[in-house]
Amino acid sequence: MPTILNLLNVNKRGRTLHDMRHDSKDKQTFRMKHLRYLLLAGLLALQIPGMAATHPIDVQPAFWWSGMHNTSLQIMLHAKDIGKCNVSIEATDIKVDSIYRPANANYLFVYLDTHKAHPQRFHLSLQQGRKKQRIAYELKARDNQPKAQGFDAADVLYLLMPDRFANADATNDVVKGLKENISNQAPDNRHGGDLAGMTRHLNYLDSLGVTTIWPTPLLCNDMPAGSYHGYAITNYYEIDPRYGSNKDYKLFVDAAHKRGMKVVQDMVFNHCGSENFLFTDLPDSTWFNNNSCYTQTGYKITAATDAYASQVDKFNAQDGWFVSSMPDFNQRNTHVMRYLTQNAIWWIEFAGIDGIRQDTYPYADRDAMAQWCKELKTQYPHLNIVGETWLNSNVGVSAWQKDSKVAKGLCNSELPTVMDFPLMSLLNSALDETTNEWDQGLARIYNYLSQDAVYADPTHLLTFLSNHDTNRFACVQAQADLKWRYKQAITLLLTLRGIPQLYYGDELAMAANKSKGDGALRQNFPGGFANDSINAFTGEHLTPLMQHTHALTRKLLQWRKGCDAVKWGSFCHFAPKEGVYVYARQYKGHVVTVMINGTNTPACVDLAHYAEVLPKPYAHDVLSGRRVNLDKGSLQMGVREVLVLDFKK
């Protein structure tokens, strides 16, 4: 639980004392404030019966902003018996709208009406009998820094796991009081990556050509084991101290913005960690599903959109818990949903993030999450939100996208972007087959794309080869050694419709198999940790395969940045013919045509068949850098060869 030092004072720049004690020039100020608030904590403990120095008041959110679209502000107060207090306010043009006192007297939820309020500091006054207490609070002015810029098909996301990317600050490897710290490099232990490492290596990511960084959750996960992955949050308003501070996170986002890059925050509103104070000290039994008692989900999330589903299947899918250590939030409780909604807004305003990835999206309440999306999009019109929609069919995925054509009888999800898991599955299997004209190899990708009418907006599909929960694209080293396999996959990923996403290490041909555990999929990035023999950030000691894969990835990414045809263009494809799959992207007269030989034999391409996407008798091949002549009626392609023909040059 945050200390009273953090909760009762945040200075004008939003810096907590935790931030200041790591800043040498502020050490004296920190000592003075530390003493001042220790005295204050003792004084407050005398004012409220049962409130000892070991039970400071937790105030969430710690501050807010004026001028927000939704002018109702929920302030949660958490301390011993605080719910027995009466509340009043000392402020200008702010009034107490309502009070929510849950069954647990350790909570008090104060709802304020701020629609006339200007930026100001004010006080909440608590009283129990003759005992009084004043809590300082601030309504800040909104700044004009970039935030909620969104992301779209012009971007390429780079998914990384902070604990496994780079350790640049050894001082936070062990944080006193937290349940898990670095012990060894076992796959499921903490390894020490942090925000300092991510910030230090922004130049690497910028040079690679990605535009948007998606780290897995950075919020505090004070769990006894497995805390490195970040999906069992124990404090929704604090960056995990083993990564750094809230200030460090804002500095990371600012540094990305200075390079013209964006940041997507991974949020988890379906569940939290079992060590979260909201679960260990329940406001009441309705905050979590099944009366806050563990009931395992059946994972059959198709039941949520199945017109024939039984009530028990629907219940098990959405109200069941992912695992026993991840209590399942009840989003139908309006106080829960207000808490979560404000948390998302707080991080956008405080850190300036550009987009949100929402974990396990279909497992949460559809109606509540639709309202969440709608409120955020009203406040931030350019914001993009992608939900983790892990279903195995395009129909299943499409039911969760805004304006879905297939979600009959359900509310509009309002979710702009969904994840194209079916395409990921195809890319991982079809390329290992020999393409025919019907149902093998690239024909399977052709068939899948031909069904895009099922999606409300195919351009708002997040596409990827793998992520932190799946086999890597190369699940064994033998696959990684097939250079053509990755060349075909990365070409498809970066030139088809949708918003591409890379998983850290894709550009280095990293291989891993989920059968060895999730930790095996989340290897350390080479060069991010002390004593690494290979340094991908500098290129030192890269293997020939790593060098080849990195160069190929960088070439395509940098080219894509300047190619509007593959970002915004229309899509036209041809049924595979003699093992070759051909498609084109066209935008304002600019044509890019891709040809892929999906067989283990050379191919002779009949160019007349593809005349409508060959506007000139020659083109520039992006991959080889050579000029390709197209004036002889046919074109020879090598085994598994890929051509990316850019007609702009």
Question: What is the meaning of each model-derived region?
Answer:
Residues 253, 271, 343-345, 349-455, ...:
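Active-site-proximal helices and loops of the catalytic beta/alpha 8
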Residues 132-141:
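Edge beta-strands of extracellular beta-sandwich domains
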Residues 630-649:
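C-terminal beta-strand-rich structural cap/linker in extracellular carbohydrate-active enzymes
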Residues 69-121, 125-129:
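Immunoglobulin-like IPT/TIG beta-sandwich domains and homologous Ig-like subdomains
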Residues 165-345, 350, 369-380, 384, ...:
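Substrate-binding/active-site clefts of carbohydrate-active enzymes
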Residues 168-190, 391, 458, 464-467, ...:
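Loop/helix patches that line or flank the sugar-binding groove of alpha-linked glycan CAZymes
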Residues 53-83, 141:
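Beta-strand/beta-sandwich contexts
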Residues 65, 140-159, 164, 168:
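Low-complexity, Pro/Ser/Thr- and charge-rich linker/hinge segments at domain boundaries
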